[in-house]
UniProtKB/Swiss-Prot annotation:
It comes from Sus scrofa. Disulfide bonds join C49-C78, C66-C92. It is found in: Secreted. The gene is IL13. SMART domains: IL4_13. It comes from the Eukaryota. Cytokine that plays important roles in allergic inflammation and immune response to parasite infection. Synergizes with IL2 in regulating interferon-gamma synthesis. Stimulates B-cell proliferation, and activation of eosinophils, basophils, and mast cells. Plays an important role in controlling IL33 activity by modulating the production of transmembrane and soluble forms of interleukin-1 receptor-like 1/IL1RL1. Belongs to the IL-4/IL-13 family. One of its GO terms (cellular component) is cytoplasm. It holds the Pfam family IL13. SUPFAM superfamilies: 4-helical cytokines (SSF47266). One of its GO terms (molecular function) is cytokine activity. Interacts with IL13RA2. Glycans are attached at N39, N50, N58, N74. This is Interleukin-13.
């Protein structure tokens, strides 16, 4: 009987350790951004944003959301990416104020918005998978 009780208590304790915890809000926002980018890339019948060009940015920095937003913010009259811009803005504002100020980016390459969105999607999926 004592052994059975010990086993039940041990399983209860280990069960609590193995149960998933709450999903952080950042992960939810990241997942929603990924879903939005998937929708944008899948529904392309015409060139995204009329083939507009944006600066290529280094998405591996700690300011990746702010850098992506900074690159896309200059695109006007493109309703397809407005929601993406708002989502990036929300993710960028999660940074401490000292990190929000964009550093000097090396701006030597412009790419089409469609390619930028595909690259951003690939990068964000990697972040989501690997935490």
């Amino acid at each position: 009987m004592a052994l059975w009780l010990t086993l039940v208590i041990a399983l209860t304790c280990f069960g609590g350790l193995a149960s998933p915890g709450p999903v952080p809000p950042h992960s939810t926002a990241l997942k929603e951004l990924i879903e939005e980018l998937v929708n944008i890339t899948q529904n392309q019948k015409t060139p995204l944003c009329n083939g507009s060009m944006v600066w290529s940015v280094n998405l591996t920095t700690s300011m990746q959301y702010c850098a992506a937003l900074e690159s896309l913010i200059n695109i006007s009259d493109c309703s397809a990416i407005q929601k993406t811009q708002r989502m990036l803005s929300a993710l960028c504002s999660h940074k401490p104020p000292s990190e929000q100020v964009p550093g000097k980016h090396i701006r030597d390459t412009k790419i089409e918005v469609a390619q930028f969105v595909k690259d951003l999607l690939k990068h964000l999926r990697m972040i989501f998978r690997h935490g």
